């Protein structure tokens, strides 16, 4: 129709959701291009995996790296005196102000002075802080990390003694107090050394030093890279490998401990690991009259060592 020849078609209103009335002229063409591969989950900021990774990284930054050469603080009068007598290369002796000077304190100060070890008198509160409020009896001795022996050194110690070897190996013992108490018992009953795994085991820390009452300065403690391999080597060398477990099929009364022997002590909770148990010549249990299911690992080790010492005296 002539009157409608110039009529405009429908025109989209500006600002509607469908966008402008005309094209972008290619300005937004990039939006049509692919965005590439989806990044891994830990690289997507809002993904739970990314949040976990960020949290772990922050915790790692906060956690101080453990120094391989950090010193230990041996606490208590007997442990300190035993370390000094054994000529452990200590760097400082701390004496709390007001400490009563008995024979052990006097001896500790005298040995330290004779060997050029720094003697520092400090407020008791300072020694409390340095020891994390552990019992120190007014004395603390700063010593380097424990110098572990080689497993072969334990056999050499027994050979030099001229007596049948009496060794103790620990399996799954993670409490340093148990380690210290066992070291003390081994020394008390004529043993020649203690063997611990290099990994997943308690180590000779200041806590173990104190619990051992200084016996760790006299008795060698060795570390084994592979406990089972070392036990097999000792068995090939003539040692009887005796496991100690509440479910053992042999009672302590039936054990012959007069020959060379290594007693393997498992933890109170886990007991002996499967491979260690398989490598034992015998697994011994301690007969008990009461309803107690098991003894603490260090107590059980002491009972067995006392029985072996009795047999060897007979």
UniProtKB/Swiss-Prot annotation:
<dbReference type="InterPro" id="IPR001537">
    <property type="entry name" value="SpoU_MeTrfase"/>
</dbReference>
<dbReference type="GO" id="GO:0006396">
    <property type="term" value="P:RNA processing"/>
</dbReference>
<dbReference type="GO" id="GO:0003723">
    <property type="term" value="F:RNA binding"/>
</dbReference>
<feature type="binding site">
    <location>
        <position position="286"/>
    </location>
    <ligand>
        <name>S-adenosyl-L-methionine</name>
    </ligand>
</feature>
<comment type="similarity">
    <text>Belongs to the class IV-like SAM-binding methyltransferase superfamily. RNA methyltransferase TrmH family.</text>
</comment>
<dbReference type="InterPro" id="IPR013123">
    <property type="entry name" value="SpoU_subst-bd"/>
</dbReference>
<keyword id="KW-0489">Methyltransferase</keyword>
<feature type="compositionally biased region" description="Basic residues">
    <location>
        <begin position="1"/>
        <end position="16"/>
    </location>
</feature>
<dbReference type="Pfam" id="PF08032">
    <property type="entry name" value="SpoU_sub_bind"/>
</dbReference>
<dbReference type="InterPro" id="IPR004441">
    <property type="entry name" value="rRNA_MeTrfase_TrmH"/>
</dbReference>
<dbReference type="InterPro" id="IPR029026">
    <property type="entry name" value="tRNA_m1G_MTases_N"/>
</dbReference>
<feature type="binding site">
    <location>
        <position position="295"/>
    </location>
    <ligand>
        <name>S-adenosyl-L-methionine</name>
    </ligand>
</feature>
<dbReference type="GO" id="GO:0008173">
    <property type="term" value="F:RNA methyltransferase activity"/>
</dbReference>
<feature type="region of interest" description="Disordered">
    <location>
        <begin position="1"/>
        <end position="73"/>
    </location>
</feature>
<dbReference type="InterPro" id="IPR029064">
    <property type="entry name" value="Ribosomal_eL30-like_sf"/>
</dbReference>
<dbReference type="InterPro" id="IPR029028">
    <property type="entry name" value="Alpha/beta_knot_MTases"/>
</dbReference>
<protein>
    <recommendedName>
        <fullName>Uncharacterized tRNA/rRNA methyltransferase Mkms_4822</fullName>
        <ecNumber>2.1.1.-</ecNumber>
    </recommendedName>
</protein>
<dbReference type="GO" id="GO:0005829">
    <property type="term" value="C:cytosol"/>
</dbReference>
<dbReference type="GO" id="GO:0032259">
    <property type="term" value="P:methylation"/>
</dbReference>
<dbReference type="Pfam" id="PF00588">
    <property type="entry name" value="SpoU_methylase"/>
</dbReference>
<keyword id="KW-0808">Transferase</keyword>
<feature type="binding site">
    <location>
        <position position="266"/>
    </location>
    <ligand>
        <name>S-adenosyl-L-methionine</name>
    </ligand>
</feature>
<keyword id="KW-0949">S-adenosyl-L-methionine</keyword>
<feature type="compositionally biased region" description="Basic residues">
    <location>
        <begin position="49"/>
        <end position="65"/>
    </location>
</feature>
């Amino acid at each position: 129709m002539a009157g409608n020849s110039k009529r405009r078609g429908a025109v989209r209103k500006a600002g509607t959701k469908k966008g402008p009335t005309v094209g972008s002229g290619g300005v937004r063409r990039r939006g049509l291009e692919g965005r590439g591969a989806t990044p891994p989950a830990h690289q997507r900021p809002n993904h739970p995996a990314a949040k976990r990774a960020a949290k772990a990284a922050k915790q790692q930054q906060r956690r101080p790296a453990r120094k391989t050469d950090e010193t230990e603080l041996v606490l208590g009068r007997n442990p300190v005196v035993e370390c000094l007598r054994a000529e452990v290369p200590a760097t400082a002796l701390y004496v709390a102000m007001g400490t009563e000077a008995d024979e052990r304190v006097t001896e500790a100060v005298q040995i330290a002075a004779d060997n050029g070890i720094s003697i520092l008198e400090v407020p008791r509160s300072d020694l409390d802080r340095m020891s994390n409020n552990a019992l120190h009896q007014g004395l603390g001795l700063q010593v380097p990390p424990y110098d572990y022996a080689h497993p072969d050194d334990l056999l050499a110690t027994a050979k030099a003694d001229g007596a049948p070897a009496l060794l103790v190996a620990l399996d799954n013992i993670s409490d340093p107090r148990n380690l210290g108490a066992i070291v003390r018992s081994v020394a008390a009953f004529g043993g020649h050394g203690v063997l611990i795994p290099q990994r997943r085991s308690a180590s000779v820390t200041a806590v173990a030093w104190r619990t051992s009452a200084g016996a760790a300065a006299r008795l060698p403690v060795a570390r084994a890279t592979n406990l089972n391999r070392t036990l097999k080597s000792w068995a090939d060398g003539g040692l009887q490998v005796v496991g100690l477990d509440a479910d053992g099929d042999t009672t302590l009364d039936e054990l012959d401990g007069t020959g060379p022997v290594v007693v393997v002590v498992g933890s109170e909770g886990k007991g002996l690991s499967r491979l260690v148990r398989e490598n034992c010549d015998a697994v011994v249990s301690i007969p008990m009259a009461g309803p107690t299911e098991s003894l603490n690992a260090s107590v059980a080790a002491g009972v067995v060592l006392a029985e072996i010492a009795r047999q060897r005296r007979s």
